[in-house]
Swiss-Prot record:
The keyword RNA-binding applies. SUPFAM superfamilies: Ribosomal protein L6 (SSF56053). PANTHER family: 60S/50S RIBOSOMAL PROTEIN L6/L9, LARGE RIBOSOMAL SUBUNIT PROTEIN UL6M. Part of the 50S ribosomal subunit. InterPro entries: Ribosomal_uL6-like (IPR000702), Ribosomal_uL6-like_a/b-dom_sf (IPR036789), Ribosomal_uL6_a/b-dom (IPR020040), Ribosomal_uL6_bac-type (IPR019906), Ribosomal_uL6_CS (IPR002358). This is Large ribosomal subunit protein uL6.
Length: 179
């Protein structure tokens, strides 16, 4: 049995889960998410516990068991608390601003970068260099934050670029001058 898959998910008070065949809908104070379970994986709600079971012992079903349990757990956390990713922009003249549903980034390139903010995400910029991404879907929040970071990953010599708050950048020494 999958160690992750056999753990049941405790549902907070304000979260409701509806299982309709292979479709699972999770609703909470922050919003609503739905997920379709693959064939052979079932979910059941008993009281305030959500459990995920599998039909057989095939290698693929064992792999999907823990994965789908984790995805459902992330949905429950998302609709009750939400997910947050914090990014910081380091560099002279590097800045960010939100204009409608577009995140405008100036990262020292010859042109500004306009990243469309996906529906369901709330992006805020403070001090022109601190970007906060909030949402109920963990995958969408992480994907958007990773895309923003990928425009200018932190470089090891001066540390310029877009990084996650708390991310440690291995620094390198520059070239040493000869005699």
């Amino acid at each position: 049995m999958s160690r992750v898959g056999k753990k049941s998910i405790t549902l907070p008070d304000k979260v409701t889960v509806k299982v309709n065949g292979s479709s699972v809908q999770v609703e909470g104070p922050k919003g609503k998410l739905s997920w379709t379970l693959p064939e052979g994986i079932t979910a059941t709600v008993e009281g305030n516990q959500l459990s995920v079971d599998r039909a057989g012992e095939s290698r693929q079903l064992r792999a999907l068991h823990g994965t789908n349990r984790s995805l459902l757990n992330n949905m429950v956390i998302g609709v009750s608390e939400g997910f947050v990713k914090n990014l910081e922009i380091v560099g002279v003249g590097f800045r960010a601003a939100v204009k409608g549903n577009i995140l405008d980034l100036n990262l020292g390139k010859s042109h500004p970068i306009n990243q469309v903010i996906p529906e369901g995400l709330k992006v805020t910029v403070t001090e022109n260099t601190k970007v906060t991404v909030e949402g109920i879907d963990k995958q969408v929040v992480g994907q958007f934050a990773a895309e923003v970071r990928a425009y200018y990953p932190p470089e090891p010599y001066k540390g310029k670029g877009v990084r996650f708050v708390g991310e440690v950048i291995r620094r390198k020494e520059g070239k040493s001058v000869g005699k």
